[in-house]
């Protein structure tokens, strides 16, 4: 689903703005993101998450492009991970609490 949506909307718009890119390049990029590495997060492999030296705040979701399981696995792997509650955006009353958690996390992990 995310691959198809990106190929139909994001890819063509990006190629229009960037003449150095082609739809073939977009296809290869999206295939690597959404197909080849589909069992985990698309930006990094598990060993990178496991070795991540910086604090990470994981806010689980349950959508086709942000499935719950990889979020939880990321939080379990990252040595300095914090995890927000889930679901955090199903009602508008929960969003301020999630925002407060993000602000607290950022303040606590601000570089000196």
Give the label of every model feature segment.
Residues 1-8:
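Alpha/beta-hydrolase-fold enzymes
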Residues 8-9, 16-45:
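Hydrophobic, aromatic-rich cap/lid helix
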Residues 46, 72:
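Active-site phosphate/pyrophosphate- and oxyanion-stabilizing loops and adjacent acidic/basic residues
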Residues 49-53, 76-78:
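Short, conserved loop/helix-junction motifs that constitute active-site signature segments
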Residues 51-52, 58-60:
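Short beta-strand/loop motif that positions the catalytic acidic residue
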Residues 61-64, 88-90:
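Acidic beta-to-alpha connecting loop that harbors the catalytic carboxylate
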Residues 64-70:
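Conserved alpha/beta-hydrolase "acid-adjacent" motif
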Residues 79-112:
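Catalytic active-site module of serine/aspartate enzymes centered on a nucleophile-bearing elbow/loop
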């Amino acid at each position: 689903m995310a691959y198809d949506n990106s190929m139909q909307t994001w890819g063509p718009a990006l190629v229009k703005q960037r003449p150095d890119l082609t739809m073939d390049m977009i296809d290869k990029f999206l295939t690597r993101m959404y197909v080849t590495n589909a069992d985990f997060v698309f930006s990094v492999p598990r060993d990178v998450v496991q070795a991540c030296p910086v604090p990470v705040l994981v806010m689980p979701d349950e959508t086709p492009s942000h499935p719950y399981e990889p979020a939880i696995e990321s939080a379990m792997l990252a040595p300095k991970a914090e995890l927000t509650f889930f679901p955090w955006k199903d009602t508008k009353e929960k969003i301020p609490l999630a925002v407060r958690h993000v602000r607290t996390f950022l303040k606590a992990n601000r570089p000196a």
